[in-house]
Swiss-Prot record:
Keywords: Adaptive immunity, Cell membrane, Cytoplasm, Immunity, Membrane, Nucleus, Phosphoprotein, SH3 domain. The modification Phosphotyrosine is found at Y142, Y219, Y232, Y271, Y295. Positively regulates T-cell receptor signaling by enhancing the MAP kinase pathway. Required for optimal conjugation between T-cells and antigen-presenting cells by promoting the clustering of integrin ITGAL on the surface of T-cells. May be involved in high affinity immunoglobulin epsilon receptor signaling in mast cells. Its main location: cytoplasm. Residues 290-295 are annotated as: Interaction with FYB1. Residues 219-237 have a biased composition (Acidic residues). This is Src kinase-associated phosphoprotein 1. InterPro entries: PH-like_dom_sf, PH_domain, SH3-like_dom_sf, SH3_domain, SKAP1_SH3, SKAP_fam. Phosphorylated on tyrosines. Phosphorylation by FYN on Tyr-271 is required for GRB2 interaction. Phosphorylation by FYN on Tyr-295 abolishes interaction with FYB1. Tyr-232 is dephosphorylated by PTPRC. The keyword Methyltransferase does not apply. Signal peptide: none annotated.
Amino acid sequence: MQAAALPEEIRWLLEDAEEFLAEGLRNENLSAVARDHRDHILRGFQQIKARYYWDFQPQGGDIGQDSSDDNHSGTLGLSLTSDAPFLSDYQDEGMEDIVKGAQELDNVIKQGYLEKKSKDHSFFGSEWQKRWCVVSRGLFYYYANEKSKQPKGTFLIKGYGVRMAPHLRRDSKKESCFELTSQDRRSYEFTATSPAEARDWVDQISFLLKDLSSLTIPYEEDEEEEEKEETYDDIDGFDSPSCGSQCRPTILPGSVGIKEPTEEKEEEDIYEVLPDEEHDLEEDESGTRRKGVDYASYYQGLWDCHGDQPDELSFQRGDLIRILSKEYNMYGWWVGELNSLVGIVPKEYLTTAFEVEER
């Protein structure tokens, strides 16, 4: 979404309001209720700026930069909570709910200890600091340790490139270095515990970047070759929490009644191969002509999923979910519909329900 142009007087007013909350009330003796109200409003500023790409104070940098890593003096030091650095200099797009503890993150792609190169280290400080790093939902977090309640810094991975970088060091660890670079943002340099671990970080981030640049999850080359030789495994082959007798009969989209599960050989595909003629018009038992079903938009639940938030859709293993939108694909979520209920669903919990023949 492109931000609408704001009149200058409105931008100034918003800047003044945010600065007053951040700087003007910094040293005031506020009650707990007043502090909560202030922090709530400041969070609202950050979410609106991120959602609509508005940057009232165009200062570079990432979220909550580590004071030991990045010379931060002079920037806002207020907190969203009593001890969290205020994020007013953050300008990466589309980011919300970024102040999370290391153990609170979900959909983690890669995590572990790395040495991060500081941008401006002091004379007595080390150039490389050990950080607990996590890649989750298109974000790169780095913490003081794996139990930290808030990150030292966070940045959006989209728009970066990643590669091995042995030129960063001249000691025995040079083959364990990698970096993330961007044309219009600062670079990040890291050292892993071993060359193999560094390559794994590079591979995982590269795979994520491919996913962020498309609406489908890319496959590794060896996986593509295997798929040409094999049929899809039966869904019962997936490890999941207890299903047993709880697996329910499947209601096919566009069909009348319930299709009871049958006991057939395990090698049989779970996918229904549909002829092209069924795509345009179908005929039900009453002989009425009706519009065909878009089978490509249907996905099947791999495991039970219970939504924790009101906008999350709950479903069980085997449920057929119609995907309405993939606009939140970069965060690992799609918008789906089940039994006339609409909500977001984690794409990792879904698999294609039908294999449609191409023309």
